[in-house]
Regions:
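Predominantly the C-terminal beta-signal and adjacent terminal strand-loop region
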Residues: 17, 128-159
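Residues on the lipid-exposed face of transmembrane beta-strands in outer-membrane beta-barrel proteins
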Residues: 6, 36-42, 82-88, 101-105, ...
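Short glycine/proline- and aromatic-enriched beta-strand/turn motifs that initiate or cap beta-hairpins
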Residues: 1-31, 35-43
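Residues that define the transmembrane beta-barrel architecture of outer-membrane proteins
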Residues: 30-36, 74-80, 117-123, 159
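Short loop/turn motifs that connect adjacent beta-strands in outer-membrane beta-barrel proteins
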Residues: 1, 45-57, 72-74, 89-97, ...
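Transmembrane beta-strands of outer-membrane beta-barrel proteins
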Residues: 2-6, 57-61, 80, 95-103, ...
């Protein structure tokens, strides 16, 4: 099975450093974000060994664009990543609890004290309720956690 998906992910940004609370060159907080994701996924055929072992698993590649509504202070990064997800529990005939993780690289940051480099690792993990009214359609909503990291390649690196 092959699929293409488009998703929007609104987010709150943790205020763990003064930079995010507005102590930046622009003087405005970085409190929220919105990202758009385009993903291509595939699943193994049900008749294959992997399809039999992992019948609800899917994997693929994705691209994302982020806005933090404060381009001058932090930039508007984009990410390229691989992802994998699967069902955790089937709740009803059409509703399930699923997970997904993403791992890749992000770029187009404006270097600053919080995000010290233009290129960073992108890590994401989430839980979703997925509603499948028809076999060809899937609607998901959930919560996830995203972390961008330069791996201490540039200091200071307050995250």
């Amino acid at each position: 099975m092959h699929s293409v998906s488009l998703g929007l992910r609104p987010a709150a940004v943790t205020q763990h450093h003064g930079f995010y609370r507005g102590e930046n060159a622009v003087g405005r907080p970085v409190a929220g974000a919105l990202s758009t994701h385009l993903q291509y996924a595939f699943s193994f055929p049900a008749s294959s060994a992997f399809g039999k072992m992992f019948p609800t698993s899917y994997q693929g590649v994705g691209i994302a664009y982020y806005t933090f509504f404060n381009h001058s202070a932090i930039g508007s990064p984009a990410a390229v990543y691989v992802f994998q997800g699967a069902r955790i529990a089937q709740l009803t005939e059409t509703l399930s609890l699923d997970y997904e993780w993403n791992f890749g690289v992000s770029s187009f940051w404006k270097p600053n004290i919080a995000v010290g480099t233009k290129v960073n690792a992108y890590i994401n993990a989430g839980l979703m309720l997925s509603w499948r009214p028809l076999p060809e359609w899937n609607f998901s909503a959930g919560v996830d956690f995203t972390h961008f990291s330069n791996g201490d390649t540039t200091l200071p690196n307050v995250g």
